[in-house]
């Protein structure tokens, strides 16, 4: 009996010792001492375990008061302990009220209080804390007019936990707050949102080692405006040393909506002034007046500055300023003037449908959206707002089934393709072909799985932005009612992304599964991402992308000064004849 008591006592002692050790380990992970100051974590559940999260760490001084529109300034070190247990404010932005209460649109709206004091980042760290883990840094999208790092769809805990990476998300100013551009002014130089991102990258570079991450392994990834931002950091000399690899989801930095000239940036700033009744005696007067306005006053009129009615165009975006971007994006791509590394990138099947719903006549989330011929023609004009009449005729000819041109479904799907090809897919294909000539390894995907629980109507297909939930592991959450096949797809995508971040190659070195091939300019191979076994294809939408990337620009350039070909009446037939002749010559010589 005495021996049994001793055994029990000894066992209890061992257990208590283990508990103390575990508690000590837990306490050692509670605080992180960064170069800015001490940060206290929160411990959050993930699947059947836990992970450490550091939410709302400041990386810049609040851009408020006279700091509105200025470049960011680094956060001054703090004394005491920064409590990083709750998400930060969302940046001031336009809120989508088109479909109040509808979860498909509400999921993208701010879910925290909006404030100009919003420059914070979030970090998810596996537990126990790793020694030198790969770092993945997310940049959200939203057309440079909206977006928040705190959205449920961007919760980094599943990706960090399942793939054992340190996951970071940052915030940056959007709309006029981040991209008002008066070139030559230090008070509103433009590209402040991109500089916010760069400052966050610098903070991560300087401090991520204290969280168990390796600063030499940072992979940037982002979607839509986020992936345009990622591409812009690839191009910008001042950003290149702050990360190693890049993942671009749904597009590239050269998309037609993603940047404007400094002259157009200034015109939009002046137009904002006019809408808010500000004085235009000088840039200083204009900026001071805009600083005195409430944030919502700027947001309420920001769409008024666009030069024409359009789809997939946004008011305040990056400018090609000669500083962040030394020269035009095209000249930098042609010269190989960018960071040469491995990139993984791709698009979704129906990149255009979301934007048609918000701007084109005849489209509705509550119907099949069968589009009349008249509405189709109106949609073409909105989709290619810079084109003259002959250019619009060319787009119409390219995307019309002339055996069935009054078919409402074909007209609907044709506009979906026009918007997606013009604004996302074909700019990406132009970028990837230019980049691959100089890069060190490129992988291309085509995401074509429509989630089983998607609340948007069937006609919208595989929508812009709806691969993100698979990248961040939401199908692993049983309560969200994804299928087992979708959970497997999400795990596969997360593993592709993380393996690429770790090695520069999404494939497992010794896996017997089908391989994701390198993209080359000659073969242009890519894979489908869906619940089926991997399939390899070549030359993604090559016919349409030759039209957008080569033919249409030459056509518009050739007819830019010919007023007759842009007028109505009898010149329409002249335009068709010119188009046909130009097409024949193009096919012969190109």
From Swiss-Prot:
GO molecular function annotation: acetylcholinesterase activity
Residues carrying covalently attached carbohydrate according to the record: 83, 440, 481, 557
EC number, UniProt record: 3.1.1.7
UniProt GO BP: acetylcholine catabolic process in synaptic cleft; choline metabolic process
Gene3D superfamilies: alpha/beta hydrolase
Any Pfam family matching the protein: COesterase
UniProt keyword list: Cell membrane, Disulfide bond, Glycoprotein, GPI-anchor, Hydrolase, Lipoprotein, Membrane, Neurotransmitter degradation, Serine esterase, Signal, Synapse
Expression tissues: Found in the synapses and to a lower extent in extrajunctional areas of muscle and nerve, and on erythrocyte membranes.
Keyword Signal: yes
Residues annotated as catalytic: 224 (acyl-ester intermediate), 351 (charge relay system), 464 (charge relay system)
Protein name: Acetylcholinesterase
């Amino acid at each position: 009996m005495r021996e049994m008591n001793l055994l029990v006592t000894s066992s209890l002692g061992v257990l208590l010792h283990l508990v103390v050790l575990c508690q000590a380990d837990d306490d050692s992970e509670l605080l992180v001492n960064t170069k800015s100051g001490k940060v206290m974590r929160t411990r959050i559940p993930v699947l059947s375990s836990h992970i450490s999260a550091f939410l709302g760490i400041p990386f810049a001084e609040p851009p408020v008061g006279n700091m509105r529109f200025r470049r960011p300034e680094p956060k001054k070190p703090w004394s005491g302990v920064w409590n990083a247990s709750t998400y930060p404010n969302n940046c001031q932005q336009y809120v989508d009220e088109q479909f109040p209460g509808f979860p498909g649109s509400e999921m993208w709206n701010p879910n925290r209080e909006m404030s100009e004091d919003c420059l914070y980042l979030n970090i998810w760290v596996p537990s126990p804390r790793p020694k030198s883990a790969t770092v993945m840094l997310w940049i959200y999208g939203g057309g440079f007019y909206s977006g928040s790092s705190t959205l449920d769809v961007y919760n980094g805990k599943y990706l960090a936990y399942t793939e054992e990476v340190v996951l970071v998300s940052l915030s940056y100013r959007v709309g006029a707050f981040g991209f008002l551009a008066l070139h030559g002014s230090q008070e509103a130089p433009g590209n402040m949102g991109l500089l916010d991102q760069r400052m966050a990258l610098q903070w991560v570079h300087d401090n991520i080692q204290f969280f168990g991450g390796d600063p030499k392994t940072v992979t940037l990834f982002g979607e839509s405006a986020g992936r345009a931002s990622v591409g812009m950091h690839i191009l910008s000399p001042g950003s290149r040393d702050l990360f190693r690899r890049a993942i671009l989801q749904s597009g590239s930095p050269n998309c037609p909506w993603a940047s404007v000239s400094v002259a157009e940036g200034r015109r939009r700033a002046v137009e904002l002034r006019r809408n808010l009744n500000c004085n235009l005696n000088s840039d200083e007067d204009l900026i001071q007046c805009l600083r005195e306005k409430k944030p919502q006053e700027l947001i309420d009129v920001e769409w008024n500055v666009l030069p024409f009615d359009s789809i997939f165009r946004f008011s305040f975006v990056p400018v090609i300023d000669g500083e962040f971007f030394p020269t035009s994006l095209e000249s930098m791509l042609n010269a190989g003037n960018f960071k040469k590394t491995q990139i993984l990138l791709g698009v979704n099947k129906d990149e255009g449908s979301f934007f048609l719903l918000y701007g084109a006549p005849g489209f509705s989330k509550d119907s099949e959206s069968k589009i009349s011929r008249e509405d189709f023609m109106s949609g073409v004009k909105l989709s290619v707002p810079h084109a003259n009449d002959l250019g619009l005729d060319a787009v119409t000819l390219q995307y019309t089934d002339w055996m069935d041109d009054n078919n409402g479904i074909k007209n609907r799907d044709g506009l979906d393709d026009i918007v997606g090809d013009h604004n996302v897919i074909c700019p990406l294909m132009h970028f990837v072909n230019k980049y691959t000539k100089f890069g060190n390894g490129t992988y291309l995907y085509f995401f074509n799985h429509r989630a089983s629980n998607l609340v948007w109507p069937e006609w919208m297909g595989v929508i812009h932005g709806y691969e993100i939930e698979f990248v961040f592991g939401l199908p692993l959450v049983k309560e969200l009612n994804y299928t087992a096949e979708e959970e497997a797809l999400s795990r596969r995508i997360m593993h592709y992304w993380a393996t690429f971040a770790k090695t520069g190659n999404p494939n497992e070195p010794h896996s017997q599964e089908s391989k994701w091939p390198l993209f080359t300019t000659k073969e242009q191979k890519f894979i489908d991402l869906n619940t089926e076994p991997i399939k390899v294809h070549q030359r993604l939408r090559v016919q349409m992308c030759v039209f957008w990337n080569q033919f249409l620009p030459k056509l518009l350039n050739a007819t830019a000064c010919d007023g007759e070909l842009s007028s109505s009446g009898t010149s329409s037939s002249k335009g068709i004849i010119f188009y046909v002749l130009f097409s024949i010559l193009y096919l012969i010589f190109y």
